[in-house]
Amino acid sequence: MAKFSLIILASMIFALNGCSSQVVNYDRYSLIEDVSAISIQSNYNVEVSLNESLNQLGIVLKTSDVSLRSANKHLWSSSLRSQLESIFKDVLYKENFAKNTSFAIYVNKFNGALDGTVEIDLSVAAFKNNKQIIFKNYVRKGKQDASGYDALVIKLKGFYKEICKEIVADIR
């Protein structure tokens, strides 16, 4: 009887061990691979805030007209907020933009959709000498060039850089 109990116990341990040894792979995506450290450390005053649905580790997909899903295995390499701030600082730095302007950016949409649509919707308030000089909404919507998360991230980054350059042009 004790031998039988020992065999059952050993079988249960092996079964539990098999369940816990499954490896889960996560893909991490970066928007700032080509951003220089000097741009990130520059003294530009940029503050990005995100719609709560974007405050996730996972890349967000629109699954219907009223639902969004944060991916479980396709994650941002670091906070989306800090990556978007870094990209905007990089654009400002490369454009030799004056550092006496501060920016408040609210990102409402920064997502893909199941049909391959990519969408960004954000507003920008810029201030110079404590006076608001611009308050404007910027939108981009289009299709991915290929399927998959890589293509989604590439398109989101491209759209966001376009918007950043447009903001700089609107203020100049």
Specify the residue positions occupied by each region the protein language model found.
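Mid-chain, structured segments of secreted extracytoplasmic proteins
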Residues: S70-F97
